């Protein structure tokens, strides 16, 4: 089954909408097809496969932050082309140069087209996801809006920390912006010490 939600945002130029869908009751090692629709625009059919529990390959990407995502798009596409049997991709943070700039998020999403619409991805935030439009540290609101991540960490710090299993590997994703976290959530370390 599937359920979805939309979030309206503004990048200072145009309104944008971020849509999420949560799929449940998927079967292990099964291929699925889907497509998206916005108004009268319907995408082509895309497919993905769920974890079968066996050995797997992942494409791991470093910082992709850029003023122009043309080069990054070519690098990401080539890495995936050379690893078409990859089960998932992992992006190690600093996806965009400025975390509150919606234009950069849209450019990053376009640069990952053909990859993230076919295999699942695990993303983590870097310090660039924490920049405001005036280049000061800020809560990573755009990052948190763009990704619907497993909700299995501390409820007060949703999507900053999460974990998931793929095959026989347990992945743990951490947010290492410790000084910023302490500023935004002053009781974080005391609370976690008691857990």
Model-inferred region functions:
Residues 1-60, 77, 81-82:
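Acidic, histidine-bearing metal-coordination/catalytic regions of metal-dependent phosphoesterases
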Residues 2-16, 59-74, 99, 180-194:
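Acidic/histidine-rich helix-loop elements
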Residues 14-16, 31, 57-60, 90-93, ...:
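A generic short-segment signal for beta-strand/edge and adjacent turn/coil regions
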Residues 22, 31-38, 42-47, 104-195:
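Extended active-site neighborhood of metal-dependent phosphoesterases/phosphodiesterases
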Residues 25-27, 52, 60-66, 168, ...:
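Short, flexible loop/turn elements at secondary-structure junctions
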Residues 55-130:
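Conserved, compact domain cores that house catalytic/ligand-binding motifs in diverse enzymes
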């Amino acid at each position: 089954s599937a359920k979805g939600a939309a979030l309206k945002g503004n990048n200072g130029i145009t309104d944008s909408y971020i849509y999420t869908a949560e799929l449940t009751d998927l079967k292990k090692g099964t291929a699925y097809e889907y497509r998206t629709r916005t108004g009268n625009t319907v995408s082509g059919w895309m497919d993905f496969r769920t974890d079968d529990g066996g050995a797997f390959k992942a494409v791991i990407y470093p910082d992709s932050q850029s003023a122009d995502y043309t080069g990054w798009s070519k690098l990401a596409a080539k890495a995936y082309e050379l690893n078409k049997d990859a089960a998932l991709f992992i992006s190690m943070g600093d996806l965009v140069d400025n975390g509150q700039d919606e234009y950069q998020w849209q450019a990053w999403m376009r640069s990952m087209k053909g990859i993230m619409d076919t295999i699942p991805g695990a993303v983590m935030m870097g310090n660039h996801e924490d920049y405001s439009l005036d280049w000061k540290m800020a809560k990573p609101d755009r990052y948190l809006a763009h990704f619907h991540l497993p909700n299995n960490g501390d409820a007060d710090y949703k999507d900053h920390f999460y974990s998931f299993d793929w095959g026989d590997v347990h992945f743990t994703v951490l947010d290492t912006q410790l000084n910023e976290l302490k500023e935004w959530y002053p009781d974080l370390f005391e609370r976690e010490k008691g857990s």
